[in-house]
């Protein structure tokens, strides 16, 4: 066994896998999943374990384009979302969650994903640090979001304009009525983008996800994930 001083003198060897190289996507995740790859649109995209409800690939494609249209046209003036804006999703897993995330991706809007166990103070840091404009919240977490807005000095009226209840089968409508908010259903069924926002060439380096660390040893750290990195993941 050579000692460490001789390692640098040893010839280098490159080992090449026998598995062919993958052709990596050079587009957005939305385009890769719904335009480039070929899958039966009737197949399930997501299944809700607790209820057995299914969201098919066709459903998800249709609803995400409707969502992308809705955030441009149905949100209050001054809070509508366009390419390059940032929105927050504050919700545990549900069938509404993929509609929101893929809807934001289709519209070219950056998504920052908040831990559904956050307190209002923890949520306030991520909301302000990410520069999110609108929060899509699970019905049960609406009080946390409203408390967060109060903490950072946003008026009750403006808070209601920046908050959308994210629910598709549960008590979203009831919560929306109680607090005077829009809900997911208000954004759907009014039209759809004719196509998703495209990310090609240098545009594939644009940020589409802002994920945050747990903040165990200090404030959570934001991590930017660009369009092309998202599209790489399903390739593997």
What residue spans do the PLM features occupy?
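N-lobe entry segment of adenylate-forming
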Residues: 1-86, 102, 107, 170-176
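Conserved pre-ATP/AMP-binding loop-to-beta segment of ANL
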Residues: 41-44, 180-182, 188-212, 219
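Conserved AMP-binding A3 loop
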Residues: 54-58, 199, 208-232
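Conserved S/T- and glycine-rich ATP-binding loop of Class I adenylate-forming
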Residues: 87, 104, 135, 207, ...
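Conserved coil-to-alpha-helix start sites within the AMP-binding
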Residues: 91-102, 117-121
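Short hydrophobic alpha-helical segments of the AMP-binding
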Residues: 97-105, 111, 230
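Structural core segment of the AMP-binding/adenylate-forming
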Residues: 106-190
